[in-house]
């Protein structure tokens, strides 16, 4: 079932993020909207994760839709959802065989337990520390038992703001993100990190619902 945005503050945050990305959607897509331009370890990580999936999947916060198409090309039954209409319009043009929808991750228009997987690849970084637990619970709601989640984020001191090019974002430590996942009903399966010279530390956590 669809759940309404829970608070006025959350809806304001969504509006700010939507506006910020809408203003940079064309540039963002040009610079970061192709899988070939992504780090090869990210490509391998997501492709390996996708091998476990056997049912409907959502790319939660799909942005320009490139990872959605990447998984679609590998036979995954996937839909991309994003808060930013400009991203969705562009994705539908670039990848016409893939379904995309405008939606907030706080209130997905999906039935309980309807998904086998959720990809949240750097799409949770703009959530304030007080907001992230509710969104993780929403992702757990739409996943079936033993459903798969893959989260990508910038690793650092938890809830510390980072200098993001588009709008305010936050670091998370692996320990804290793992605790939040546990609180939301997930069991962590594995963690991978990478550190590129002169760049922010990156982390990915694979988890399943209990």
Regions found by a protein language model. Name each.
Residues 160-176:
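Acceptor-substrate binding/catalytic loop of class I
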Residues 6-53, 66, 157:
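Conserved class I S-adenosyl-L-methionine
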Residues 195-210:
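Core SAM-dependent methyltransferase catalytic element
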Residues 106-118:
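A short acidic, Gly/Pro-enriched loop at the edge of an enzyme's catalytic core
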Residues 146-153:
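Conserved beta-strand signature within the Rossmann-like core of class I S-adenosyl-L-methionine
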Residues 116-131:
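A short SAM/SAH-binding and catalytic strip from SAM-dependent methyltransferases
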Residues 58, 64-107:
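Class I SAM-dependent methyltransferase SAM/SAH-binding core
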Residues 133-145:
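A short glycine-rich, Lys/Arg-flanked "PGG" loop and its adjoining helix->strand segment in the class I
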